[in-house]
Amino acid sequence: MAELRAPSSLSTERNGSASNTDVDKQKLNHLYQNGNKKTGSAESRMLVLAETIRAETQKLHAYLESNGIAQPDLSVDAPDDFPPLPDEIQESRQKIFLASRELTDIVRGPRETVRYAVWSYLDTLSLQLINSYGIAKLVPLDAPIKLTELQSKTPLEPVHLARALRHAMTNNIFREPSPGYIAHTSSSRILAQDPALQAWVGFNSEDAFPAAGHVLQALKDHPEAISSTHAGFNYAFNTVGQEPMFATLGKDLARAKRFAQAMHSFSHGEGYKVSYFVDNYDLSEVDKRGGTFVDIGGSHGFVSVELAKRWKDMKFIVEDLPKTIESAPQPISDDKTVADRISLQAHDFFQEQPVKGADVYFFRWIIHNHAKPYAVSILRNLIPALKPGARVVINDYCIREAGSENAWDEKLLRNMDMIMGALLNAQEREEWEFRELFEAADPRFKFKGVQRVENCKMSVIEAVWDE
């Protein structure tokens, strides 16, 4: 797909291709996947992993030290995040993490690994209680607080507060410097200070967590798992056959606001910046002719604003549901040359596309919310508006074949696939599944392929209308 460009300092990877970068990542993945590389004994494998951890930690430490960057630790004043790192140092982080995870499983043993994996929901439970009661904000940043004093500030009984805190401490969230005194670690401190992170924990523990617990029942009752009103979320909140998750959240202002903040927190994590798309997707031909870019389900137009800063002659139309459009900031940008080229329009993408003859129709974080029949319907609703050569661009996850994904990202992508199923009976897709969506929508869609910019977790999937 020629339209996705990468500067010389960034490489792009086509899903399933065999570029040198892909080969290197596959080798790295191969090295750290359990069972993929067997050594003579469990002992020798442990030594290989231990040496990897030592060597790569030395590299990371040396880079941070030589560049005057604070060393990470668990103390209350530790850095919130890693700064952007050179590729080879980021790779050291990945190797440390992956080797540590494998070594943990080896020394724990297979039976214990499985036995305790199923208890991971308890990590969510303790965080749910701490976040819901605002415990992190009640602990002073600069000194410990007596547990009995902390309890007096909450409606929780002492045993329940202590239980939640001491469980979270096993995940390095809070610490007990002396018996009966609670103090912050870096993780509990940032939970106290970051409202978007609080929203992320709240949404996942109070909305998604119950949904996950009801997936089994949903699958037993509806094994086809297609309808967005028969997902685990619907069973958890008694809306089976009535409405999808987004409608339920939309009726509750507090939950809707929390969801929006949670998505803001997630989308600002490593590998999600909109700049990956803005800086690398080529709109020069569209800009040259003063063309139109339609941002479908574009919320308050943050993608279009960034694109309009780069491309000076294009026009942008941001479409979303009426309540979302009504709540958008006015003006949409302080830069008049940007704001004047962006218009907002109420539209439900399950209805026929009203903007005819645009050059690009764009979906970011939209298609993955929908099972195949709904996703196909969304694409078909574009057809009456499409002119020959119009591009349909999807900015979403695209999962590589099992075992070929960078292992650093594999868990994240698989987690996202699971949660989309739990919330909406939706899914993350591989390249062939995106191709199938376009083919099912109309054979006049010509699938151009998938590309992903180095270090970005999201892909660009593109088709062109060829009537």
From Swiss-Prot:
pH effect summary: Optimum pH is 8.2-8.5.
- Major enzyme class: transferase
> What functional role does this protein have?
Chlorophenol O-methyltransferase that methylates chlorophenols into chloroanisoles which are thought to be responsible for cork taint of wines. The only single chlorophenol (CP) methylated is 2-CP; neither 3-CP nor 4-CP are effective substrates. Within the dichlorophenols (DCPs), 2,4-DCP supports the highest rate of O-methylation, and the activity decreases in the following order: 2,3-DCP, 2,5-DCP, 2,6-DCP, and 3,4-DCP.
InterPro entries named among the record's database cross-references: COMT-like, O_MeTrfase_dom, SAM-dependent_MTases_sf, WH-like_DNA-bd_sf, WH_DNA-bd_sf
Show the catalytic activity: 2,4,6-trichlorophenol + S-adenosyl-L-methionine = 2,4,6-trichloroanisole + S-adenosyl-L-homocysteine
The record's region (Disordered) falls at 1-41
Q: Which UniProt keywords apply?
A: Methyltransferase, S-adenosyl-L-methionine, Transferase
An example molecular function term from Gene Ontology annotations: O-methyltransferase activity
- Known regulation of activity: S-adenosyl-L-homocysteine acts as a competitive inhibitor. Also strongly inhibited by low concentrations of several metal ions, such as Cu(2+), Hg(2+), Zn(2+), and Ag(+), and to a lesser extent by p-chloromercuribenzoic acid, but it is not significantly affected by several thiols or other thiol reagents.
One Pfam short name = Methyltransf_2
The UniProt entry annotates the active site at H368 (proton acceptor)
Please list the residues that bind S-adenosyl-L-methionine: D320
In the induction comment, the record states: Expression is specifically induced by several chlorophenols, especially if they contained three or more chlorine atoms in their structures, such as 2,4,6-trichlorophenol.
- How is this protein used? Chloroanisoles such as 2,4,6-trichloroanisole (TCA) are known compounds which are usually associated with wine faults. They belong to the family of haloanisoles which are key substances responsible for cork taint in wines.
Q: Which family does it belong to?
A: Belongs to the class I-like SAM-binding methyltransferase superfamily. Cation-independent O-methyltransferase family.
Classification from the root reads:
Eukaryota, Fungi, Dikarya, Ascomycota, Pezizomycotina
Please, one GO biological process term? secondary metabolite biosynthetic process
The UniProt regions of compositional bias labelled Polar residues, in chain numbering, are 8-21, 31-41
Thermal characteristics: Optimum temperature is 28 degrees Celsius.
Is Nucleus one of the keywords? Answer: no
| Identification of the protein by name | Chlorophenol O-methyltransferase
UniProt organism field: Trichoderma longibrachiatum
Report the EC code(s) recorded for this entry: 2.1.1.136
Coiled coil regions in record: none
